[in-house]
Amino acid sequence: RYGQVQITVNDQEPISVEGGSSLLAALTDRKIFIPSACGGRGTCAYCKVKVLEGGGPVSPTETPFLSPQELADGTRLSCQVKLRQPIRIEIPADLLAVREYEVRVESIVDLTYDIKRFRFRLVDPERIDFIPGQYVQLLTPTYPGNNEEVYRAYSIASDPGDRTAIDLIIRLVPNGICTTYCFEHLKVGDAARFNGPYGEFRLSETDADIIFIAGGSGMAPIECLLHHMRNTRSTRKAVYFFGGNAVRDMFMAEDMARFERDLPHFRYIPVISRPEEGDGWTGETGAVAEAVDRHVEADSAAEAYLCGSPGMIDAA
């Protein structure tokens, strides 16, 4: 046992915590929320903080995720830093504004065979301020088959004009801790918790043309950005390529049609890579990147916003 260990954050008054745990876990217990999407396994690299003193040696788990400059300035993965001695750290000021929200499940809607839309009504506090494109971390409690609390990151999909509820679009991951909880255990009326908001994914404040590219639950942040464009009466030219393997992977066509009506310079182009006979699909086929090439001039100065599987993003 290491007894009590002091953590000094941004040179403020030290906080005292029980030693032996990870820095990430200790900060979370004290309601200081650092982004993390892998349950503290050291695989997402979201939980970076600058350790000025007392972090101990950098572990082999961390080094693949840290650039030479980050290693030089003391950046660490907070989930891999064990609290064994007094530690002094520096975190971005905006993370100190992140807080925890108690919410209630208001609705659950099937979008496809493996994607659902969850609406969470805020209870305490009753409002959330966020920038369109940001995400929250949903808490998964223990349940049969899962004996640990974990957080998972999900982008906000809903209209930022309503700050009293948020929608998350969640795709079922086979054996995924959080998605199994959401799909098999979470019911309308249940209480839940998340923290946030986080993230730098947002629309630039330029007049450049926009290319959105997404697939699956990557729809969420793009939908939020489209709501924002409609709310601000944006006149920017935008085209949205949404990819799926088959017709059954496509959803929200009516919502996209409404955005096309409300945004005079917006086009929605769904793309199916492998349409099946009998689907009656008459739209774009093949890889999303190929559809982009067909519709966007090669020398376009458009800004691209991508959200989807690593394979789709690499191809685009």
Predicted regions: what they are:
Residues R1, P64-R121, E126:
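Fe-S ferredoxin-like electron-transfer domains
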Residues Y46, P86-R88, Y135, D190-A191:
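Residue-level marker of beta-strand positions
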Residues E100-D190, G244-A246, V271-P275:
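Ferredoxin-reductase
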Residues G133, G218, S309:
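Short, conserved phosphate/pyrophosphate- and ester-handling motifs at nucleotide-, phospho-/glycolipid
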Residues N195-A208:
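A short, basic/flexible loop-to-alpha-helix module at the beginning of a structural domain
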Residues P221-N231:
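Histidine-anchored nucleotide/phosphate-binding helix
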